[in-house]
Structure formats: structure tokens, C-alpha cells
Amino acid sequence: MRPPEFWNHREGRDAAPMIRALLSPISWIYGWAAARRIKTTESYDVGLPVICVGNATLGGTGKTPVVIYLLKSLRRLGIEAVGLTRGYGGQEKGPMPVHKNHTAADVGDEPLLLARHAPVWVSAGRDDGARAARSRGAKIIVMDDGHQNPQLEKTLTFLVVDAEMGFGNGCVFPAGPLREKLNPSLERADAVILMKPSPDYDIDEHLTQQLKGQIVIPAYLAPSTTPPRGKLYAFAGIGRPNKFFDSLRRHGGDIVEEMPYADHYKYKDEDIESLFLLASEYEASLITTEKDHVRLPKGYRKGVHSWPVSVVFEDELTLRRLLHPIIEQAQPKK
């Protein structure tokens, strides 16, 4: 689903007040159900530190690079940190570890990306996945996208917020992008990772006020390499494809055309063949995100550029201060 434009506007004609009013009863029910589930579900204590990386809104905010950063950092310290995810878009319900022969159709695209850096478990029931991971020697669990999931007791919760979109119009789905009411979502977070489009981006004053009283760690996504030379035909099926296109341009990519797809879009052979044909009209090469690249049919991947990014924290000291008690608890004793 592509998010409607009125989700991004708080007032005026672009905010579509009539549509918002019509949707508000459904939003109330959705928000009530989310709050009730969180309040009434007894969280399971797996006996290990659990770091949750979540968000308050629907769509992409940059959670996956944050999870990768945490997994790599913890494992560099000799800690057996593992990822835990629902496996959105995959058919396997788990609990099961992700293996190299799995496809996005099996476990989803995000688990495949995470599994390049650390062991990852896919489980529809997060509590079941945590138990399974612990039985295989996990010492810390990093849970991807579990802020609204109360099944597992969390030790530390990071809420990733897109600095450009913020919390949209501040309404709960479907009248807005929020997964639940904003205040409870912020109250359960230990810190907010504010994902900026670039290091010099100025944060909106309204968003600054909304985050008042929160521990805020500014961050941004930086490419691991420069864009390929020559003309590029860019495509992406992520939460906000324009972020990928804009970033490519900002770093010098010569984009002649762009093609957005729905988030987690399952590419078929004919999709890629059509893209190759369109790119050839411009004498351009195809480029996409890492997350899209793992969803491409295997036979086409070599012909498509993948442009990886990683997260850069502007206040790494605060991040490490928050992680320190967990590291102390899980680090192997000498």
C-alpha cells in the first residue's frame, strides 16, 4: 500500500479533513484495539536482554540499518547477539533460524539482510522465537519491529522516527500513519533515533516539540559506496521509495527515470524483464536498494546494481551509554 498524501498534512486542504473525519471512527477502533492488546497481554521474560527497534508509524523509517548496526557492534564485543523478526512477507511462521538457502518468499526480505551479519530467527510468536534463540545460545536478542508487540518483555526500546515525515498528521491508521496513539508509544520508548535524510537537515519545530522530554539520538543513512557511473534507472519497493531516489541523486547518481513499487513488492520475472527493457531505452543500468535486491528472482540479480547504506549516529556516546548495562550483563566473563 502506498501511503495517502493527506497522512503528511496536519491542516489545510491537503489534510483532507472530510476524509479524515469519515475515517476517524475506524481509527478509534484500531487505536483502542492496539492499546487493549498491549495492556492485557502478559509479556514473557525470556531471561535475556531484549533490545527492541521499532517505530510509531506505518512504512519505512530506517529500522533495518539500526538493527544491523546493533547486531554487528554487539558481536564485535564477543557477545552472541541474534536478530528476531516476524518475517513479514515470508510464508514461514517459525520459530526457525534463517539459512543461506532461504528466499524472501520463505522468510521475508529483512531477515535475509540481517542474516548477512548475524544469526536471525523468524517467528510469528516473538516469545516462541526468543525461547528458541536462547536454547541455541543467544545472549542478547535484537528484535526488529516489535514496539507494538507485547509478547516479549523488553529491556531497551529504540523508537526510530523519520525526521522528514515525523508522525504525519498525528492520527491513527487509517486516518493517519500512526500504529497507535502517539503518547503511549513515546512513553514506552527509552530513546528516539531520529533518522535524518542528510547530516545538515533542519528538524521541524513541531516534531521537536513532540519529542520534548525524550532522549533523542540524531542519525542518518550513509551509502557504503558511491553510485555507479553512467545513467541509472532506479526502482524500489520500500516504505518510502523517494528517500532512496533522493539519496541517490544527492550522492551524484545520474538517474534518468525512477519506478516506485509497493513496500515489500514481490518481483516477478516479467517485472524485471520490463525494467531491463525500459532501462535500455535510456542506455541506463538498473539500480535498487539492498532490501529490494534480495527479493529479485535469482537469475536477474547479477544484472542489477544494489546500493547498500549503513546508519551513522551523531551522538554515539548517548547510544553507548544506553547499551552499557546490557553489554555488561551479556559480555563473556574473563
Model-derived regions, located:
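Residue-level signal for inorganic ion chemistry
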Residues: 29, 64, 114, 144, ...
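Phosphate/Mg2+-binding loops and adjacent switch elements
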Residues: 87-211
